[in-house]
Amino acid sequence: NYSNYIILLIKFKKEEIIFMSHKFYKPAKSRLQRSELAVPGSSPKMFEKALNSNADYVFLDLEDAVSPNDKITARANIIKALKEINWREKGKTISVRINSLDTHYMYRDLIEIVEQAGNEVDTILLPKAGTASDVYMVDCMLTQIEENKKIKNKIGIECLIETALGMSNIKEIAKSSGRLEALHFGVADYAASL
């Protein structure tokens, strides 16, 4: 309880509050993820198969599973699938893996997906998270879009730790945002970064 926390801080030192973080987070949502299924955004025929699978968690992929020539089409396919398919009726947690922050695709991925279908997205999967500021950037963008578009659903963030930089900053990444719901370890990209 936040009010109890503040009261405890004040009781601890009545004259002044030595430290008070600007980050008062509610616990992130807990979602069932017994199994995950990655679906390339460039293959719409696979969306229906994913919907009818036994996977609890489906991530629609804009990153590694999509060739550079198909990125924009894949984004449009995912927006259409989010709007037209009722994933939640089948009990699916839906995530979209955007392109990493070091690409020119990431910005449009996040804006177009969330502005057009944000109420249908449970989480954004951030690849190659290297620092807490990477997560902070996505968090700030999500907040701005949600407020601007009056999106009711607060979208979570999941981070892929896939680089030596990300691993060395994992503690800071883990506590970087109240939206953060999960950390995933990307073994292949991590090994390549060493």
Show where each model-derived region lies.
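Conserved alpha/beta-domain cores
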Residues: H22, P27-L194
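Short, Lys/Arg-enriched N-terminal segments with co-localized hydrophobic residues
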Residues: N1-F19
